[in-house]
Amino acid sequence: VATIRDVAMAAEVSVATVSRVINNSGYVSEDTRKKVESAIESLNYKPNAVARSLFKKQSKTIALILPDIKNPFFPEVARGVEDLLNTREYTLLLCNSDEDIEKEINYMEMVEQKYVDGVIIVTSTLTPKHIKNRAVPVVALDRPIGENVPSVSVNNYDGSRQAVRHLKSAGCKRIAHIRGPMNVINSDERYKGYLKEVGNEPWFDHKYIVTGEFDVRKTAEVTMRLLAENPEIDGIFAGNDYMAMGVMKAARQLGIRVPEELSVIGFDGIEMGQLTSPEITTMAQPIYDLGRTAAELLLRIIEGKYVAKKHYVFEVELIAGQTTLRN
């Protein structure tokens, strides 16, 4: 494997001159630059990325910290981030935090030590104080952290209200909500939207709200109990599509037909929701665009460009599948 010294010898220049050509820093005459570039090509020399990052204190690498890579929403987000980064010759470093604050803090410290250029994070545990004095720029994705941390998210509150209204229009009279974890901002906003639409209904009871933790298995378990104890429920708003799948599994096990006896609507618009039978009705986020927008925003900050807008809030769209149709 060719080294920088081999290139210097072939081009009959110093190692320092080769370094200036590689890093495009300092003065090098045009003739010398061509000699060095020719030597690099003929020797098939690949600059050491670690050494360059130490020299330049940057690595052309972005870290994406996600809470649960098993949730199909997050790989779709990651694809949007990565595709944008690839157009700018940045590399993506993927980190899975499991909603663990210690892991998130450790990742934040790691990216500073490794000269990672910036971080896109989906977190419900870190606060502005955890971000404030970091040496790398941070963009919050899906779950805003605070006014001073740039963010990309959707209108969860309004989207959940639309979801419940759709269930009402499908003829549902008793609508339950399988919510996500407590103290997770998007989960809380979707819960508030549901409550706004049904809280004053004469039939409403808080027993119609259970927590599925954004987990398909947990959701199937709590939905089994919910429907067994409250057979009058004829509509369920699941806090995300992943949980909507758990709802449908529970309905199958109980012999409840979807949508003839139970209407189900999710939130997110993940591709997997289109592969279920019946196909899930959902409030679709522009998932891919969320990832691309977060990456574009972060790169503008890293490159010192003018940032006219620090917080992006996208609207969601009703995608009528087959889980809310009534004969």
Labelled PLM ranges:
Residues 1-59, 73, 245, 325:
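N-terminal helix-turn-helix DNA-binding module of bacterial transcription factors
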Residues 15, 33, 59, 78, ...:
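ATP/adenylate-binding site constellation spanning eukaryotic-like Ser/Thr protein kinases
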Residues 42, 83-88, 106, 136-140, ...:
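Bacterial carbohydrate/catabolite-sensing allosteric modules
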Residues 45-110, 114-117, 192-195:
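Amphipathic helical "hinge" segments at domain boundaries
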Residues 116, 121, 177-178:
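Short beta-strand and adjacent tight-turn residues that come in two discontinuous sequence segments
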Residues 129-135:
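Acidic (Asp/Glu)-rich catalytic clusters
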